[in-house]
């Protein structure tokens, strides 16, 4: 199977190459019509915090994991889970990291989470290895992007249609039977037609090992993109169609390890997770139209449709007495089992050694005692967004006005199944398949209208950027009985209307130094839970930017003053709550500072020694006491917000001479509390990870590269949710070739 996939990928690449060899091999430059910022130079001009990571920067390490890319942006927090970034946990400026559900995720400036309003957890994430740029906007800069505006937005830019006929093939192999192929070909004709063909294939057996099993713990990802465009010469019109399809088959689990087992073998997995597997399928259609009324006034219109299906079959818990049918299962979470062993406590009359024997597979369990759930969900996210941009001069002020409106609808449809198994001789045996819908039978839906207006006003050395966003959201959840027959059970609704003002200011002291300040009201929708308020915070930032030659420095302090911090129950949170419910967390405060320094230390004209430092300090805590809740637990004022490291930094140094380049990075992240109580075994380890990459440019067309991730083979607990200690990825060596034509 794997060999056939590799041959298929190489065949696709070869076919693209053979067609392209007859075409001109001129260099092309990417279009930037789907970006928020467009370049790092443009980011420095904004009256708010923003960062741009372009293609050249991405190629230094050629990562396929968004978490290893995004960590270089100050203010970004990451909770490692599977080691590959398949379903990443990313937060910005202290918002919750879980499933990246508190930041606005976009691909090509279009909402990309499976259901951004009704179910924002990112169980789909774009294949990072095919992207051409990454953008992060924070503070007042994020007011044009919603619905999550407290932390900010992450926009992923896909491969643009080349301006001339050109192609690219990247092939790499690595440890754990890993391979990756990325191939593109396309261009534009003199008549105005353009096209792009693209495929990305990625496979690995995984870096973890399941007890007494040959089952892999890796992934198998296929991704295909087609773009067609028409922009006639001497015309003010342009149209582009994007079609994208991706599927994934990965053997990922929520079941972690006890601390003692982690210390003995960090990359072990209990055989109880042998059947755990997630399969996903994603389809996207985007139609864009642009019209230039004049050189200063342009209109854009985008219609989009995203459809996503996922089926995650994984172990959920244990009923120590066993259940004759799957509907009567009395579940104890694996988290409680792991914690009982960690704390040397009994659980349901079982001693720690008896519990350990169950995890080890050394003890048989009663019939129907192990629960596995088929977490089947279908999503759609669709809508239309219009934009109007005007650049002009009024008196002695210049204006860049952006007006946008988005009409959006999304839905999550759950029809899930609990099945009962028993553990016999260290392996799982099915006892009762269960009745479809016994683990969730509901549809939640959202209709939203979002409007924003933003104006960059330049007066002398000043740039003043006021903005206003309006969100009108209607949400509904309907629950059903009787499986696929779906007889009505109950429903609930919630509606939200909110105005979100913001203001950013930049003062250009001189050609090298600028000062920035800003404030805006941030917002997160409250889901469909009645009586739950929206998450709101007043956000402030203040800092400066300095650039002189190759030296660039940015220091920004930020403060988020929450009126109400929101908690949303998901399976990955590990909390004892109903999945999909939201909870008020009352007041909280997040304060911090972001530092970014880059320079070139070389004194020779033919050598570059680029160095950079990205540092983030964050302090987040609850401001009020909260009685015991299913999500937050018991909270006292001053308790820390979970998964927020106080200190983190990424330092890098490179060496570039003629056709050779090498880069070394070191990433440090403080330990974090995984729950507000921060009791024993509720903290991660601090960690320092080193990556090394090198490449050699043999010609304009051929580049060879190699990469070592986790050079020193660190083994640290980077997560404990939902069911035990989780590791970072082991040391991994990869080699690849990049061919341009």
Question: Where in this protein do the model-derived segments appear?
Answer:
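Gram-negative outer-membrane beta-barrel transporters
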Residues: 24, 390, 395-396, 458-464, ...
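N-terminal periplasmic "start-of-domain" segments of outer-membrane beta-barrel proteins
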Residues: 30-61, 86-89, 103
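Extracytoplasmic beta-strand/coil segments of soluble accessory domains associated
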Residues: 67, 71-110, 114
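Short acidic/polar hinge/loop motifs at secondary-structure boundaries
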Residues: 110-138
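Transmembrane beta-barrel wall of Gram-negative outer-membrane proteins
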Residues: 166, 173-203, 212-253, 277-294, ...
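Face-selective signature of the C-terminal outer-membrane beta-barrel domain
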Residues: 238-239, 281-480
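Membrane-embedded beta-barrel scaffold of Gram-negative outer-membrane proteins
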Residues: 290-292, 298-316, 508, 514-518, ...
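Structural signature of Gram-negative outer-membrane beta-barrels, strongest in the C-terminal barrel
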Residues: 379, 391, 395-410, 439-562, ...
